[in-house]
A protein has these predicted regions:
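Short acidic, glycine-rich surface-loop motifs adjacent to enzyme active sites
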Residues: 230-247
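N-terminal secretory signal peptides
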Residues: 1-30
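Solvent-exposed loop/turn segments at secondary-structure junctions
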Residues: 68-71, 109-112, 137-141, 176-179, ...
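N-terminal active-site segment of His-dependent metallophosphoesterases
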Residues: 50-118, 218
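Alpha/beta-hydrolase fold active-site loops
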Residues: 60, 101, 160, 168, ...
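N-terminal twin-arginine translocation
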Residues: 19-22, 26-33, 43-55
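Active-site neighborhood of phospho(di)ester-bond hydrolases with catalytic His/Asp-centered motifs
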Residues: 65-66, 103-107, 132-137, 238-241, ...
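Extended active-site neighborhood of metal-dependent phosphoesterases/phosphodiesterases
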Residues: 54, 114-233, 258-268, 282-318, ...
Length: 330
């Protein structure tokens, strides 16, 4: 097949079999590609050439995974739910070969059923680097009485938070905080979110979808304060979440316009990275990069990344279906 033809002899020699999940996995190969693309809102409007990544040494590297979305169920279309455990295991083994400061999973760690978290633990606990999670809509597709336990199951004491490394402030948002699925069905917050969704649909917004959500007003104020503090401290900022902000389409967070306006006002803010839209995407607007990573779940091929952070750019080294690219900072 074309997929197998793309492997080098060295890759064939390292074929390994995951007997637990009953299939042979071919290690994803990667090369660092530095892509300049024009003409599409889904493509990069400001992609650096390869030389830019060499202007300064990497400050640190970290792992990136989006939409593992595991469940012990049969495939449906292009979604291979059960196979995601083996894909995650493959990603963990690859990430463990590198000196990573941390790793991030950008939401939808599971597809459904609270037991799915337990079934992934033997895989994810092998990861050597510290793992941070952003919450996704499918993470709450569990029994109603267990919804409140999801954040702690993912090791979160707060559903949105900040951490610091090498002169950068990393902000992880909770774009599920206001949504129709986060809380039990008769909860006042759920009823309020349902009303908000109806209003967005009446206004013709493409992102008026039940699988989306937004940050709360309180979280928005927290984000604003974090950006102000980073500016005062001379820090650069990378922001992460599950739902896209741009380009504006059916997968975006409900308050994507307000978030874009806020982030673009702060020169310290360099990029927003997210999952949710499994086919990926990129847009550059008003000095900000908005990068959607490919979902691990889709197709039999894997998708994950190494991110190499430089002072002047972020180099994404993609594996499997994930494209490699370098985005230059303003």
């Amino acid at each position: 097949s074309p997929y197998l033809d793309s492997f080098s002899l060295k890759a064939f020699e390292s074929i390994w079999t995951n007997r637990r999940f009953g299939r042979t996995l071919y290690p994803v190969t990667t090369r660092r590609k530095f892509i300049t693309t024009t003409g599409s809102t889904m493509a990069a409007a400001s992609i650096a050439p390869a030389a830019d990544a060499d202007k300064d040494a990497p400050l640190l590297s970290f792992g990136l995974i989006a939409d593992c979305q595991y469940a012990d169920v049969d495939p449906a279309g292009t979604r291979f739910y059960r196979q995601s455990a083996a894909k995650l295991d493959q990603a963990v083994n690859q990430l463990n070969r590198h000196d990573l400061r941390f790793s991030l999973h950008l939401g939808d760690f599971i597809d459904r059923d609270f037991k799915s978290f337990t079934e992934l633990k033997p895989v994810i606990t092998k990861l050597k680097s510290r793992l941070y999670h952003a919450l996704g809509n499918h993470d709450f597709d569990v029994e109603e009485h267990l919804k409140s336990k999801v954040p702690s199951e993912l090791g979160l004491t707060s559903t949105y938070y900040a951490f610091h490394h090498a002169g950068f402030r990393f902000l992880v948002l909770d774009t599920t905080e206001v949504s129709t699925y986060r809380y039990p069905g008769k909860n006042a917050a759920t009823l309020s979110a349902q009303e908000e969704l109806r209003a967005l649909a009446a206004a013709g917004k493409p992102y008026a979808q039940s699988w989306n959500g937004r940050v709360s007003d309180r979280q928005f104020l927290w984000l604003t304060e974090q950006l102000k503090q980073a500016t005062d401290a001379g820090e650069s900022v990378l922001v992460f979440g599950h739902h896209p902000i741009l380009p504006e389409e059916a997968h975006c967070t409900w308050n994507c316009g307000a978030l874009h306006k806020l982030l673009s006002q702060f020169p310290c803010c360099k990029a927003y990275l997210n999952g949710h839209r499994h086919s990926g995407g990129h847009q550059f607007k008003d000095g900000m990069h908005y990068l959607t990573l490919h979902g691990m779940l889709d197709t039999q091929d894997n998708a994950f990344s190494l991110a190499h952070l430089h002072r002047s750019c972020l180099e994404i080294e993609g594996f499997g279906r994930q494209q490699s690219r370098t985005i230059s900072f303003r």
